[in-house]
A protein has these predicted regions:
Chain B
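ABC ATPase nucleotide-binding domain
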Residues: 4, 24, 60, 337-339
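The feature captures the beta-strand-to-loop junction immediately N-terminal to the Walker
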Residues: 34-36
Length: 327, 360
């Protein structure tokens, strides 16, 4: 409130305004508290524990659940990791896996499915999208078993049974093309997320705008290029960001399909290594400390990537200005 | 461009958008589609634009049947109620978009966009985005975008409905002026009869997917061919009254309860010949409050409109809307004598709702 002749505020008024400020401050934190508690319990505390484990040599041979009794070894695990001859290979495996799956499936195929199913009859589009959600909602074990059955060696594999029927040579598909299978199997799961986001973004573009483009002289392809894609730019960037991070940390399907093989670390990715080292070492010795070092680096990579994405894609603008309104 | 629509039907599943519409529009003509919400105006317009495929019937632009021609190959400009500007493009890019799609050279694009922008008075706004413009400015941009490609046909879908009343009045004049200057065949969809009456050469009145009338504005007003048209065109709307018309010593008499109104042969003979009850229509401006009138009644409500008073007068069970000079200072409850100008009365068949005076 502005008064015409401003007098210095009385101390009572000053106290009152401080009290109001405090109240709105507490109100804001009150609303954030439930989410904050979840982040604390399920993210910050586990990160702190893993961080601590990564500077101990905790393993099955010297196991203890007492944090105080664990043996502190400084950065030795990290030194071992950087000198590990396979860590380099696993690192590039991870980049390859994330980039290829993301670009071919989680973004491109998701976009193609969304565009196709929004350009055909509504209910047919709905059915196709529902089919694409199946890999996501099927339990990973069942889903991977289906793929394994499909691709198994003769005489068990379905594909190979066809090969035999047709008199073609048979293949051990997964063993000969492990990366193709790892990418396709994960890609099929990854399509649904982008598909749902892109479809709802496309469907929220006002009909008038889409009609206007056709009347203005665009073909349907030109309308996608000049109107639809620019208008779903933010959902696109969001899916790229979110799916990069989610692919970085996913390993269950790879574990079930190839378990990082065949051979030494052919399809091993970083998050799977963390699991292997910490919980399922080939040599029967679970190295929790060493595995934690892998996990800590993964968290750091994830956080750095998230920050880079937010900077490059300027998500702060998205939050600052209601873009949706302009649609 | 001459447009001929023959027996056009467009259905969405079981829902009828428009049915059996036949309409021939002359080259350079300004035609309004007038009708209440949901009567099929937009459906017809989008079918003409090529967004919807006709379920049945023929649409011809000139001699070319365009039923299956893609929108981009029809050379039409369209203006939407929501403006439909591309939010991610600048105003310049919005107007240039149709030219870009036609692969017009950049320098020609530049020139034409600036020219159109100047005509529309938006030359200074070219670097802005649609979100930074007022509604009126956005509608000018939309109009500019429709005009820049020099279309053969202009389609308007309630372009002024989202503007305030003052702006609507200005834009009404400007659109009409532009259309006459450019001579582009135009179809203008509106539910506002004042817009239709003031702008159009001819008005197609639609109701529930059917064409009710297609005539010049004064024809529709003076010689409505259906009861719907009579009631829809004109503000305040026409009064309707169930009457019996019978000959009475050389004249005719329209009767309803205590009301008795004398009629000349020109207007009286057809309803009398029809036999049985008919619907009489009389416009508010054709009823006067006088000292010695045809009937006496009581004023029920007075609504001041500024220039005049809108009066709801009751005669027995029948109500009439009429207009009176504000200086007379009529008050509710006042007893008044009403004079009906029966040379302007309309008569309709109560079943078919067709006019008994004007045959289709
Ligand atoms: N895309 C559509 N799908 C189904 N029904 C529609 C569609 N478009 C319009 N309709 C129906 O067709 C009728 C006419 O609608 P419309 O042409 O939009 O009316 P108006 O523009 O005169 O208000 C309405 O009953 C409407 O519900
Ligand atoms: Mg409409």
């Amino acid at each position: 409130m502005s008064e015409p002749n401003r007098k210095p505020k009385s101390s009572a008024a000053l106290l009152q305004s401080r009290r109001n400020a405090l109240r709105s401050y507490l109100g804001a934190y009150g609303f954030m508290a439930p989410a904050g508690v979840l982040v604390l319990i399920f993210f910050l505390i586990p990160v702190a524990i893993v961080l601590y484990l990564s500077v101990t040599n905790l393993a099955s041979s010297n196991f203890t659940s007492d944090l105080a009794k664990m043996e502190f070894i400084g950065l030795k695990n990290y030194r071992t990791l950087f000198n590990d001859q396979f860590a380099r290979k696993i690192f590039f495996n991870t980049i390859f896996y994330v980039l290829v799956t993301l670009s071919l499936f989680n973004v491109s195929l998701a976009l193609i499915v969304s565009l196709l199913t929004t350009h055909i009859d509504r209910s047919a589009g709905f059915v196709f999208r529902a089919l694409w959600i199946l890999p996501r909602i099927t339990s990973p074990v069942v889903y991977i078993l289906i793929w394994k059955r499909m691709a198994a060696e003769a005489p068990f594999g379905i594909l190979n049974q066809f090969n035999e029927l047709l008199g073609n040579p048979t293949y051990n598909y997964v063993a000969t093309n492990p990366w193709v299978f790892v990418v396709v199997v994960n890609g099929f799961i990854g399509v649904s997320f982008g598909m749902i986001i892109f479809t709802s973004a496309i469907e929220s573009i006002p009909k008038d705008l889409l009609n206007a483009s056709l009347v203005d002289g665009s073909s349907r392809m030109q309308r996608i290029r000049y109107v639809i894609l620019p208008l779903i730019r933010w959902p696109l960037l969001f899916v790229v960001t979110y799916q990069t991070l989610s692919l970085l940390t996913s390993f269950v399907e790879i574990q079930l399909l190839t378990d990082g093989g065949p051979g030494l670390y052919r399809t091993e990715v970083w998050s799977l290594t963390a699991f292997h080292r910490a919980l399922s070492n080939y040599f029967g010795n679970a190295q929790w400390g060493y595995g934690s070092a892998f996990a800590v680096l993964l968290v750091m990579i994830g956080v750095v990537l998230a920050v880079i994405y937010m900077r490059v894609f300027r998500f702060d603008e998205l939050v600052a200005e209601p873009r949706v309104e302009a649609l | 461009m001459e447009i001929r629509i023959d027996n056009l039907t467009k259905k969405f599943g079981d829902v009828v958008g428009v049915e059996d519409l036949t309409l021939h529009i002359d080259d350079g003509e300004f035609v309004a589609f007038l009708g209440p919400s949901g009567c099929g105006k937009t459906t017809t317009l989008l079918t003409l634009a090529g967004i919807y495929k006709p379920t049945d019937g023929l649409i011809r632009f000139g001699d070319r049947v365009v039923n299956t021609v893609q929108p981009k190959d029809r050379n039409i400009g369209m203006v939407f109620q929501s403006y439909a500007l591309y939010p991610h493009m600048t105003i310049f890019q919005n107007i240039a978009y149709p030219l870009k799609l036609k692969k017009t050279p950049k320098n020609v694009q530049n020139e034409q966009v600036r020219q159109v922008a100047n005509v529309m008075g938006i030359g200074e706004l070219l670097d802005r985005r649609p979100g930074q413009l007022s509604g009126g400015q956005q509608q000018r941009v939309a109009l500019g975008r429709a005009l820049v490609k020099e279309p053969d046909v202009l389609l308007f879908d309630e372009p002024l409905s989202n503007l305030d009343a003052r702006l609507r009045l200005t834009m009404r004049g400007e659109i009409k002026h532009l259309q006459k200057n450019l001579g582009i065949t135009s179809i203008y969809v509106t539910h506002d009869q004042v817009e239709a009456m003031t702008m159009a050469d001819r008005i197609a009145v639609m109701n529930r997917g059917h064409l009710q009338a297609f005539d010049a504005p004064d024809e529709l007003y003076d010689r409505p061919k259906t009861r719907f048209v009579a009631g829809f065109v004109g503000n305040p709307p026409m009064n309707f009254l169930d009457v019996e018309v019978s000959p009475s010593n050389g004249h005719f008499l329209a009767q309803a309860d205590s009301i008795q109104l004398p009629l000349g042969a020109e207007r009286g003979a057809p309803p009398a010949g029809h036999g049985g009850p008919v619907v009489m229509g009389i416009r508010p401006e054709d009823i006067q409050i006088v000292d010695e009138g045809d009937v006496t009644g009581e004023i029920f409500v007075v609504e001041p409109l500024g220039r005049e008073d809108l009066i709801d007068a009751r005669v027995g069970p029948h109500g009439f809307i009429l207009l009176a000079d504000t200086e007379k200072q009529h008050r509710a409850g006042e007893r008044v004598s009403l004079k009906f100008d029966m040379t302007q009365a309309q008569f309709f068949d109560p079943q078919t709702e067709r006019s008994l005076l004007w045959r289709q």
